[in-house]
């Protein structure tokens, strides 16, 4: 979601850059070097960060040594605070192409194939993004043809009891087979995001219901404007359509 990779990641990246800047400045004072002439590297043997003069690793200090010396010299703590609230909020996008099959005898809707395109800028973790888009489609499909909250029209209170019998959830056998779900990521770059990234969570679910409903319309020629499109709803609509054609 945007609040994660974009807001949280952006804040972390900004803090890391500021702390690095402070580290190099303090290290320069301790090592009698200009901050711009130092570099921050990873000491793989010691498993810790180190500031050194490029080309002269013998003239270096660990991050821990620099931080301790800064405190001992009363130069303050090397730290920085930033807000998760970012100055920008770039939109993310998804597009769904859905193939459905409608059994006109039972009203059951199945999805043989799905193609999803997602735009989250530079994907920080492509596998995680694809997994989120896949999972979000399954949730959206469930919203479209299965899940329904029944409320009291007068009080607004829920009439369901929280049982699987009164709040239908699709099982894995009713979900689209993951092998038939193709997910592609657009190669874009968000200049205000960390390393060009932006969120995807908000858009991952947004167009699923419309795509499935449009595919159902293309299959049986009936528009549905209320969800869920359950088998009972499909059969009633088909019966009404058949009656209208005979009249």
Predicted regions and their residues:
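C-terminal catalytic domains of large/alpha subunits in multi-subunit enzymes
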Residues: 1-247
